[in-house]
Amino acid sequence: MRSINMIVVHCSATRADCALTTEDLETIHRRRGFRGIGYHYYIRRDGTVVNTRALELVGAHAKGHNTHSIGICYEGGLDVQGCPADTRTPEQCSALRLLVHQLLKRFRNNVRICGHRDLSPDRNGDGVVEPEEWVKECPCFEVSKAL
């Protein structure tokens, strides 16, 4: 098993009024040149957790951080106008908390939990990645406060 030191939460950047099936997600990732879905888990709007990549395999979800991380993506992240928003359903929130808890229990080491946006470069060098430095807004909520 790989050494894991980070869990990275993502959104699928899907509008709140549109569905993105696991098959759709796989098609998108294959078109980007991946061998399949880059995330290890995908959480549908109804809270269903789909294991989309074996944990033993390196993900393709956070460039420069894939080797020692697990990627979790929730369906959503855009409001009906297509703007970044926390569109997680109560079922997704519960499923995400439970999944992260299970992963922390399994790996038992010092695992950082963060959003994809938190991996943006610290452009002003003050030691904090602030909203104006985010390369993207994904996952559209404050992971450190929600989990």
Tell where the protein language model's regions lie, with residue ranges.
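Ligand-binding face of N-terminal immunoglobulin V-set domains in extracellular IgSF glycoproteins
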Residues: 72
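Basic/polar, cationic surfaces and motifs that engage anionic cell-wall
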Residues: 1-8, 12, 45-49, 65-68, ...
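Short, conserved "active-site rim" segments that organize catalytic pockets and cofactor/ligand binding
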Residues: 1-57, 66
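Short beta-strand/turn micro-motifs at beta-sheet edges
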Residues: 59-61
